[in-house]
């Protein structure tokens, strides 16, 4: 995911300050995620959870999702409307998919990440982290498509 981010940053970097800030926030989220999942290199063994890493990831996750929905997507849809009906329609579809993705991630957050982690739910927590990683990868692909639609036209 960091390689994908690097490619997109090189593609659009410097052309739009808002996008640059967004991509930097994505990088911070990915670093926090990798730090958190890297804490348990042996998935079979129970190890102590770094609560600070979990808190950092959760804060970055909520901030990233909120910024996208309440700030960036709206601006991108407005920008798409200035290009063409086709770009606007595709961007609107992407926005709908992103809303569904946010709901999926927040369901994981509410049911697994925000709860206390102990021996009984450690495996479930690790599976939830993996699912969040997959959902983030899907989200980044959707966001990248939206960025390209708006800024290629």
From Swiss-Prot:
InterPro entries: Rsd/AlgQ_sf, Sigma70_reg_Rsd, Sigma70_reg_Rsd_AlgQ. Keywords: Cytoplasm, Transcription, Transcription regulation. Gene3D superfamilies: Regulator of RNA polymerase sigma(70) subunit, domain 4. GO terms for cellular component: cytoplasm. The gene is rsd. Belongs to the Rsd/AlgQ family. It is found in: Cytoplasm. This is Regulator of sigma D. One of its GO terms (biological process) is regulation of DNA-templated transcription. Binds RpoD and negatively regulates RpoD-mediated transcription activation by preventing the interaction between the primary sigma factor RpoD with the catalytic core of the RNA polymerase and with promoter DNA. May be involved in replacement of the RNA polymerase sigma subunit from RpoD to RpoS during the transition from exponential growth to the stationary phase. Interacts with RpoD. Its main location: cytoplasm.
